[in-house]
């Protein structure tokens, strides 16, 4: 009898020990550890919120096995216009061979949400544009342009069109990283296959399409309701290049009673602005670029090498060296805590996917162009550089630590007191109001800017 009881006690102790080991070593997706840490998959600890939008939110995360920071994009599983899985599929379609694409580490459920874990990158071109007093030199614009032509060529080679060109979607690498000089392309929530995967044929030309993209940069044909193709991505890039050189575009700041009227005015002004006037006082190559891409046929494959050569020849003729000495090099660049930039005043729109806050059919007050403080994400200070407090003071992270963050290696989910991923890591994920699905299950820009009051920053 005693022997039987001892065996029973031993089995109970063994079962309890195994359960404790399993609890420690194997965490289901989207569960919390005993210390209340929210996990995505077995590796990724969810940290503070660094962005949000109609379809979910962005969190800072950390890979507990490599000690590296990541970005975690969350979307409610029951979203009426889900796009995260489609974006993940596009990232996989693009693969990891192309330069200037963020690595995607994981996709899976996180409680009532789908989660995509991405490489954490540096600030966007819009942030850097602000840092450089909203004008880039010709050398910097040419180094950006040559790289982005290659990025877009690669995206197109994978049978995708991007459809959301804007400075907020192009990021440099993180400071101190070997890829810090590389311009990355992110956020494929509006991308579309322009080659039918079954027939292998180019999608047909159509008209009366809804606006998809960012009004400030989108092509003239997009304003006219024409189906987008490769030519439209390149025209939008050309508009962005001129934005960087000029500091603004002639169709910015137009007033109208409704958003629909405003988008109409933007399109009309683009059509009525001669390329020569848009590119006045800048090298002829800028006008040549825009003339070429605007003359492309809907089905035509652009000559990317011709366009790159246009800019590389100009670069060499000016005596520049491709040394990645951008205008922002040497300036106090804050260290970003998010790799997916939040929306600016030039918000992306799509009417073929859902009813959006910027949809022209909605009668709502127009937003004024956002200030630079609204455009920026949340930042940490990089103390190794001489900081300009007048620039940085109003742009610090809500959970700043007054200096570099010291991270202790951890694989057990325990939080170091100085770890930014520990801040509000188990805070509830707030789902935003659902939107009406109109046509395709795609979203427009994933993140909205959130203004943070000074008092909130110091909480």
Swiss-Prot record:
Tissue distribution of the protein: Expressed in both the striatum and the neocortex.
Pfam families: CK1gamma_C, Pkinase
EC number of this enzyme: 2.7.11.1
Top-rank taxon: Eukaryota
Catalysed transformations (reactions): L-seryl-[protein] + ATP = O-phospho-L-seryl-[protein] + ADP + H(+); L-threonyl-[protein] + ATP = O-phospho-L-threonyl-[protein] + ADP + H(+)
Cellular compartments annotated: Cytoplasm
Chain intervals with Polar residues compositional bias: 15-34, 361-372
Binding site residues for ATP: 50-58, 73
Domain Protein kinase: 44-315
Post-translational modification Phosphoserine, affected residues: 344
GO biological process, one term: Wnt signaling pathway
Key words, A-Z: ATP-binding, Cytoplasm, Kinase, Nucleotide-binding, Phosphoprotein, Serine/threonine-protein kinase, Transferase, Wnt signaling pathway
One annotated GO molecular function: protein serine kinase activity
Region (Disordered): 1-34, 351-388
Family statement drawn from the similarity comment of this UniProt entry: Belongs to the protein kinase superfamily. CK1 Ser/Thr protein kinase family. Casein kinase I subfamily.
Classification via PANTHER family: CASEIN KINASE-RELATED (PTHR11909)
Biological role stated in the UniProt entry: Serine/threonine-protein kinase. Casein kinases are operationally defined by their preferential utilization of acidic proteins such as caseins as substrates. It can phosphorylate a large number of proteins. Participates in Wnt signaling. Phosphorylates CLSPN. Regulates fast synaptic transmission mediated by glutamate.
Protein name per UniProt: Casein kinase I isoform gamma-1
Gene name linked to the record: Csnk1g1
